[in-house]
């Protein structure tokens, strides 16, 4: 039986990204990536229920990320969709001929937090593309390994279900150039 995919966000599927109002929280902007330890660290995702902007940890946050599950695989343009090992490939396939940009990050990575608002802005600018985020925690380690991640953040650009470009580190200009190259090529 073919998998049926819903292409609109579920009203209960919103999660806030962990960007603090003070920026990188003490991380130097010179550092552009974090190494992923071999052991892998399972991270806890904080959820906001009433849109009040406070995570479980008590930190204020700024932007919103859509989260999906296999039951509600959501592909939308103009926003960032949080994926996991179970929903990534179905969403990439559902995107059809659209270019897919994937941000592979961790909750504890300072440079990932610094570039997250810029990544969100790109999703709003490039309405003809699908922007995804994958938390490279222990649960998603098999997919991260399959995609060949060594550092976070790593950005993968996919066309026709294949990786065509990769940018490692929080290098906004390089990411922008890779997106433009994928669009024109």
From Swiss-Prot:
Active site (record annotation): 109 (nucleophile), 112 (nucleophile)
Ranges for the Thioredoxin domain?
Answer: 59-184
- Report the domain of life of the source organism: Eukaryota
Look up keyword Kinase and say if it applies. no
For this record, the Gene Ontology CC terms, alphabetical, are:
chloroplast; chloroplast stroma; plastid
Which CDD domains does the record cross-reference, listed alphabetically?
A: TRX_family (cd02947)
Q: Name one GO biological process term.
A: positive regulation of catalytic activity
Location (main, coarse):
plastid
- Describe its PTM? Glutathionylation at Cys-136 decreases its ability to be reduced by ferredoxin-thioredoxin reductase and reduces its efficiency in activating target chloroplastic enzymes.
Q: Which UniProt keywords apply?
A: Chloroplast, Disulfide bond, Electron transport, Glutathionylation, Plastid, Redox-active center, Transit peptide, Transport
The record places the site described as Contributes to redox potential value at: 110-111
Give the modified residues of type S-glutathionyl cysteine: 136
Give the matching Pfam families.
Answer: Thioredoxin
Name this polypeptide is given: Thioredoxin F2, chloroplastic
The subcellular location is: Plastid, Chloroplast stroma
Organism, scientific name: Arabidopsis thaliana (Mouse-ear cress)
Family membership, please give it: Belongs to the thioredoxin family. Plant F-type subfamily.
Q: Highest lineage ranks of the organism? A: Eukaryota, Viridiplantae, Streptophyta, Embryophyta, Tracheophyta
